[in-house]
């Protein structure tokens, strides 16, 4: 499965592993075993790089940390449902990144793990995704 890229999608995910290797004392991440063992309904926090065209027509890069609720895993790739709205984007029809969009990611992208209440995860995962990532 293809992962997002700035060139194609105008957004991508930073590697939490690379960030940790660069700044091990100030950027901690869960163990690989924890990041690799998540299941449906668990939450994973990811670091996004988002390209936005400003009012002057200039392209600018914004970084946002957002949560996803894991829906499934396909051939080693997690598919999470975005559980945040990017602050740098308007929630309109031409933006892929909106609350409820499918987000593909790998264990290397996870910066934090949470275990939301089951009723919340069930609610989020029983909705149809607002955006579906190509399989």
Protein language model annotation of sequence segments:
Residues 1-135:
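Mixed-charge, low-complexity intrinsically disordered regions
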